[in-house]
Amino acid sequence: MKKNPKISLIGSGNIGGTLAHLISLKKLGDIVLFDVSEGLPQGKALDLMQAATIEGSDIKIKGTNDYRDIEGSDAVIITAGLPRKPGMSRDDLISVNTKIMKDVAQNIKKYAQNAFVIVITNPLDIMVYVMLKESGLPHNKVIGMAGVLDSSRFNLFLAKEFKVSVKNVNSIVLGGHGDTMVPLLRYSTISGVPIPDLIKMGLSSNKNIEKIIDRTKNGGGEIVKLLKTGSAYYAPAASAIAMLESYLKDKRQILTCAAYLQGEYDIHDLYIGVPIIIGKEGVIKVIELQLTEEEKILFYKSVTEVKKLIDTIQ
């Protein structure tokens, strides 16, 4: 009988719990739900296993406060850290979450050095960089969840604007997972037709699309403002699951993620949101898009902002 993959979730809050539920529903593997808060992962694990029973799923879910339980994990998804609060930018979180990420990285290095690691903790581009440097894992096995989520928001708003199914919409959002992200209109399409062409046909306007771009950039903040006591968790979890599934099932999907660059886009030693192919080896290839001068300016502005934040932790 084939052994289930072992998937460890570091952090048992809203995103961690949602991840566990989705993994269980999709039967992707057995789950270790870790948290430093005693009782929280154990309680959620019990609740989730009872839910899985209704679905007829025999997936094992273990809640723990002991890092030793992640030993031998095939994949690790990290959500641990302070969440965003109203009025707080992702970047305000940097100092406290850097300390948390360093601790998580040391334990992954100790117990799960062969795992594929997905970081969700904000500020994302910095946290995934810290994970790589502190864990010593190969860069093709450490990525950040960014562009999948940003693109999903952009896709939704575009689908509403053009009154079509979200299945007809494809978009690419490059850059840092924050206010400087770059939704690329030329590479964003409705059933293969680029958005600029649809504007020329009179199906939308530059003004409306600019509003959608701004809303996409502030997508996380909009939800924080509405919730008042937390931040988005369903869509971030679903985004990470798409990445995890591409790895576990060797689907070789092209997904926009925070990936480590070593010369691609003329960028060295930095994590930034770019399209990548994810398969059983982890990051198989970074897709280098041909950018216009205007797109390059926006992209490198985003890169500069990420570099500035990394400088604050070194």
UniProtKB/Swiss-Prot annotation:
- Would you say which domain of life the source belongs to? Bacteria
> Where is substrate annotated to bind?
84, 90, 122, 153
Cross-referenced Pfam families, in alphabetical order?
Ldh_1_C, Ldh_1_N
Q: Name one GO molecular function term.
A: L-malate dehydrogenase (NAD+) activity
Is NAD among this UniProt entry's keywords? yes
EC identifiers of the protein: 1.1.1.37
**Alphabetical list of InterPro entries matching this protein:** L-lactate/malate_DH, Lactate/malate_DH_C, Lactate/malate_DH_N, Lactate_DH/Glyco_Ohase_4_C, Malate_DH_type3, NAD(P)-bd_dom_sf
Gene3D superfamilies associated with the record: Lactate dehydrogenase/glycoside hydrolase, family 4, C-terminal (3.90.110.10), NAD(P)-binding Rossmann-like Domain (3.40.50.720)
Provide the GO biological process annotations. lactate metabolic process; tricarboxylic acid cycle
UniProt keywords, alphabetically: NAD, Oxidoreductase, Tricarboxylic acid cycle
Catalyses which reaction(s): (S)-malate + NAD(+) = oxaloacetate + NADH + H(+)
Record carries keyword Transport: no
Write out the catalytic residues in the record: 177
Q: Where does NAD(+) bind?
A: 11-16, 35, 97, 120-122
Known HAMAP family for this protein?
Answer: Malate_dehydrog_3
Q: What family is reported?
A: Belongs to the LDH/MDH superfamily. MDH type 3 family.
The protein's job, in short, is: Catalyzes the reversible oxidation of malate to oxaloacetate.
* PANTHER family assigned to the protein according to its UniProt record, in alphabetical order: L-2-HYDROXYCARBOXYLATE DEHYDROGENASE (NAD(P)(+)), L-LACTATE DEHYDROGENASE
Q: By what name is this protein known?
A: Malate dehydrogenase
Organism encoding this protein: Rickettsia prowazekii (strain Madrid E)
